[in-house]
């Protein structure tokens, strides 16, 4: 079967975004399908209601009032980062991600929504997901443009931090009803689908969990550092980080700190700029991992590391749903950071964890096998 995949793909430094796309394509190809990534623009066609716009403005004003120190600190840090790193670093990261795309993904040209409506790529089925594609309200990712006789499947689609509203549900309801099968990444997504009139949505694992550690080791770089180290990976979403505590822990354990930051995370600390292959290797060979990233947590689990996942704060706090959906069923809820860094030392029965992850992965695979 010829399958077109639609998900986010333009990233310059979001490792999880590109790896979930890679995993979806790789798994479907392992079933014998011919797959390709449909590259698209992100034109929006949803206008929030006056009430939603007012609520958004009030939330923004409140955050500025409640956390002025945070916005001031980040503005200063951003300026210092750009002055000291400049475009050279960013260009290098862009180049490495583009090389990964060219080497590992089969891609179409870039389509606009209008072009997709008039002349879509030929396919027997389209699969949308994963990532927060349904947090955008783009008709593109709801396959509003796809013809009726083409199979439409959503795999582990995420609404991100979006809350249900009548306007939003009315918009997406006719689009969701056209899908042959719908699955979401978070339990909260099932509720939102029900509110939009789709009561049969299932919760499945992120596509990165359709592959195992050995699959990723095949594309990962060899070990980069001889010394023992702890790996830190933070995204720019607001997170309460006690850096003094982190450095004290590393000193006590005689560990180096390797710190990769992406998606707008800026601060005064030294960063390591890693390719996707290097990023995988850095997690795989670390003594400990600390992250506020969902995908950072996924790969930490796959590689069997001691870890802490930092919850995000403020308006983005709803994004923690994906972390709890991932960790709580595995009995790893205590590894969500609560101020005690020594929780890094909690023993983890990875034989049991990997068995449970394999069962959840099997459910995701069965969903795809059944509906494609």
Say what each PLM segment does.
Residues 1-372:
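Active-site anion-handling motifs in enzyme catalytic cores
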């Amino acid at each position: 079967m010829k399958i077109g995949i639609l998900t986010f793909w333009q990233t310059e430094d979001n490792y999880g975004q590109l790896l979930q796309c890679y995993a979806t394509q790789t798994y479907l190809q392992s079933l014998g399908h011919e797959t390709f990534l449909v590259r698209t623009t992100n034109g929006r066609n949803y206008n929030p209601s006056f009430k939603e716009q007012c609520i958004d403005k009030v939330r923004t004003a409140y955050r500025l009032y409640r956390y002025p120190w945070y916005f001031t600190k980040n503005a200063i840090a951003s300026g210092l980062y750009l002055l000291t790193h400049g475009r050279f670093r960013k260009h290098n990261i862009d180049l490495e991600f583009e090389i990964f795309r060219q080497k590992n993904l089969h891609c179409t040209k870039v389509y606009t929504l209008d072009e997709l409506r008039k002349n879509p790529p030929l396919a027997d089925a389209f699969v949308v997901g994963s990532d927060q594609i349904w947090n955008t309200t783009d008709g593109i990712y709801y396959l509003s443009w796809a013809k009726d006789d083409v199979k439409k499947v959503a795999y582990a689609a995420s609404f991100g931090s979006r809350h249900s509203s009548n306007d939003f549900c009315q918009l997406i309801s006719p689009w969701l009803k056209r899908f042959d099968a719908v699955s979401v990444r978070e339990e909260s997504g099932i509720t939102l689908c029900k509110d939009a009139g789709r009561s049969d949505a299932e919760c499945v694992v992120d596509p990165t969990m359709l592959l195992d550690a050995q699959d990723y080791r095949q594309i990962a770089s060899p070990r980069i550092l001889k010394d023992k180290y702890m790996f830190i990976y933070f995204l720019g979403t607001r997170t309460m980080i006690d850096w003094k505590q982190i450095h004290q822990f590393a000193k006590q354990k005689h560990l180096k700190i390797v710190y990769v930051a992406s998606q707008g995370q800026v601060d005064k600390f030294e960063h390591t700029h890693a390719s996707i292959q290097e990023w995988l290797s850095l997690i795989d060979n670390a003594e400990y991992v600390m992250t506020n990233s969902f995908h950072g947590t996924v790969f930490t689990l796959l590689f069997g590391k001691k870890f802490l996942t930092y919850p995000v704060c403020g308006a983005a706090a709803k994004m923690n749903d994906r972390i709890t959906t991932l960790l709580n069923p595995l009995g790893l809820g205590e590894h969500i950071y609560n101020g005690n860094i020594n929780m890094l030392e909690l023993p983890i029965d990875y034989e049991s964890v990997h068995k449970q992850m394999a069962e959840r992965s099997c459910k995701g695979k069965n969903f795809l096998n059944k509906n494609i």
